[in-house]
């Protein structure tokens, strides 16, 4: 029998595949970022080095297929397709929240398939901050072992929890538990927002807690408040529907959050990353990697080859962006100048950030 958590997972997957769930009135901010074109790149585009070492694992490009799904029998072929594509192209991949497998061990195979299909890829596990207090270190270790994870993402999705009628709205003690997990588990811990962004204040707290990386998960991509609007309409829950509508675009856009979160930790740019140019802009702004989920949902329902096609296109775009910026490798892109304008510039100035440094060559990232 399918439990509530498992049923919710397949509902989320179907909604993301079939309904408009992206931010509506706010963008990730990539249009406010200009890379400096080099008319004389003096490089062979086919010889660029896109490889990167991320949290102890070599990847063929600084990109991860972000957490999408798992925890329902119908999600197994989806995760199989995503993982096989990640393995073929040498990028990383995260699993969806493993909570469903804790609630029902029969669902473990929908997560294990990721490691089975991607034996050499960087794979990260996934559990909610609201749940780690309940599971403790022992429970978290089981999640890690389930997929032989290279890292563990602890997702911070309190916006979604606030809107879900079944949401866990008690956020007390989460930071202390994150610190305990970081000190006890054998693999890196990633603090992962899921669409509302990370502020400077929280980045500093997470750094102090001992996380190894931050996934900024900013506004501009999938709105989980928006996803809950559709669920609320289906269940005829006007209170949750109103909350979701109100907070559909709530949070910090991805580009702004990237700069907010620069606290001497590796950063993952997630939220509205849709092209290889977005990946390049993210790396130039200081991210160690970029990731996306929604662009792969539809293709994953079709199979591995469809995922490979979409991902290959993004990586080709990324290679072209590096070439046109005169960057032979990822470190060169880290050090390349960018110009930040528009709404993002105004936001960052009001928050006290000096973005002029980004326009200087060899800026220290």
From Swiss-Prot:
A GO molecular function held by the record: NADPH binding
Cofactor(s) the record lists: FMN; NADPH; Mg(2+)
UniProt-listed GO biological process terms: isoprenoid biosynthetic process
Keywords: Cytoplasm, Flavoprotein, FMN, Isomerase, Isoprene biosynthesis, Magnesium, Metal-binding, NADP
Sites where the protein binds Mg(2+): 161
Reactions catalysed: isopentenyl diphosphate = dimethylallyl diphosphate
Major site of localization recorded for this protein: cytoplasm
Enzyme kind, highest EC tier: isomerase
Subcellular location: Cytoplasm
InterPro entries xrefs: Aldolase_TIM, FMN-dep_DH, IPdP_isomerase
NCBIfam families, A to Z: IPP_isom_2
Subunit description: Homooctamer. Dimer of tetramers.
Role: Involved in the biosynthesis of isoprenoids. Catalyzes the 1,3-allylic rearrangement of the homoallylic substrate isopentenyl (IPP) to its allylic isomer, dimethylallyl diphosphate (DMAPP).
Matches recorded under HAMAP family: Idi_2
Family affiliation: Belongs to the IPP isomerase type 2 family.
Protein name: Isopentenyl-diphosphate delta-isomerase
Species: Methanosarcina acetivorans (strain ATCC 35395 / DSM 2834 / JCM 12185 / C2A)
